[in-house]
Amino acid sequence: MYTVTPFPHMLAPLDLGFTTMKNRVLMGSMHTGLEDHKKDFPRLAAYFAERAAGEVGLMVTGGIAPGVRGSLMPFPSGLFNRLQVPRHKLVTTAVHEADGKICMQ
């Protein structure tokens, strides 16, 4: 049986200066398909909140277009006008309520 943990700091908090992560576990970006339709944002919020509650320190969203030219397909998820802010706020609020951190890709 191991008496030494190979990654002793993995579950320790990490102070980034502007925020502190509860641990060093990062969930990399993956495209779920939920970010492509505004009707699915409540499901996307629940998806990320569940992982935040499950002790993931930082999650990275699937690709979110920063502008129309950055779109990979017609009518993608984006954050390039004020009308798109509320649906993204739904996700960040759910994650923060579960004591998580999230970063948009």
Spans of model-derived segments:
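Flavin-dependent oxidoreductase catalytic cores
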Residues: 1-105
